[in-house]
């Protein structure tokens, strides 16, 4: 699918801005063509030291990237590893957030808990000003994720890669997430559509969110208001 076709898909679903997760060079090209339709997440190796910090600055200041992306799934370096700390400090200075992979992985050649929410707790304690979004919402450690969202003011989560229609199913493990997401944590949750992973149209995923037992103002927050505030899109 071309980017133009993808934007058409976004338009049909009522999506104004999408988040890009790809190689830095690919994202740079897309942002140059469609700067008002996408947010770019920068991928920087924790092994690159100050070279990586300088590259993050370049991507943000010259190429329009909006956040740092950290994923232990790929490099097997947990997000709380101190090699990431210069990057987190620079994110605070640049006033950009970081999206951290927070989920169990199914790869059999690496530890299953590389993305455990406990790593976020240490980061949030060490960098209280850093805006963090827990990508994939910490499944299957959902209760721990809920507790950490309550504990840290600048910690948020997104629902990418999880089918929304299962959030309300008894025994799914999402019970506390949905309960608190409709009340105390309503300002902390952002929707990730992941429609291609589900094999259904983008607008169908939006409809599944609309069918959840969420209060109307809460649904609006999940769908866009929380992301608008988190990414400073006002």
PLM-predicted stretches and their roles:
Residues 66-67, 80-190:
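Catalytic pocket-lining loop regions of alpha/beta-barrel enzymes
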Residues 16-17, 24-114:
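Active-site gating/metal-coordination segments in enzymes
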Residues 54-59, 172-174, 234:
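Short, surface-exposed amphipathic charged segments that create phosphate/polyanion-binding patches used
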Residues 1-13, 17, 185-188, 199-234:
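Mid-to-C-terminal alpha-helical segments outside catalytic/metal-binding sites
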Residues 10, 27, 59, 91, ...:
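Conserved, mostly hydrophobic/aromatic
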Residues 25-26, 140-141, 197-200, 204:
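Short alpha-helical
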Residues 10, 31-35, 60, 124, ...:
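N-terminal cationic-hydrophobic initiation segments that often serve targeting/anchoring roles
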Residues 5, 26, 51-55, 141-144, ...:
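Short acidic active-site motifs
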């Amino acid at each position: 699918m071309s980017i133009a076709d993808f934007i058409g898909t976004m338009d049909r679903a009522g999506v104004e801005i999408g988040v890009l997760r790809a190689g830095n060079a690919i994202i740079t090209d897309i942002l140059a063509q469609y700067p008002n339709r996408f947010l770019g997440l920068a991928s920087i190796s924790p092994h690159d030291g100050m070279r990586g910090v300088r590259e993050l600055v370049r991507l943000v200041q010259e190429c329009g990237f909006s956040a740092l992306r950290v994923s232990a799934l790929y490099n097997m370096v947990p997000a709380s590893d101190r090699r990431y700390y210069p990057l987190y400090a620079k994110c605070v200075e640049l006033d950009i957030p970081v999206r951290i992979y927070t989920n169990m992985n199914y790869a059999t050649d690496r530890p299953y808990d590389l993305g455990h929410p406990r790593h976020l707790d240490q980061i949030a304690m060490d960098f209280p000003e850093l805006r963090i979004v827990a990508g994939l919402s910490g499944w299957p450690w959902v209760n721990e994720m809920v507790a950490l969202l309550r504990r840290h003011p600048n910690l948020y989560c997104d629902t990418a890669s999880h089918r929304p229609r299962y959030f309300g199913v008894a025994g799914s493990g999402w019970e506390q997430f949905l309960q608190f997401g409709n009340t105390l944590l309503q300002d902390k949750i952002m929707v990730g559509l992941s429609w291609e992973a589900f094999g259904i149209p983008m607008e169908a995923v939006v409809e599944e969110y609309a069918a959840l037992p969420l209060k109307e103002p809460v649904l609006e927050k999940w769908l866009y208001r929380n992301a608008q505030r988190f990414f400073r899109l006002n």
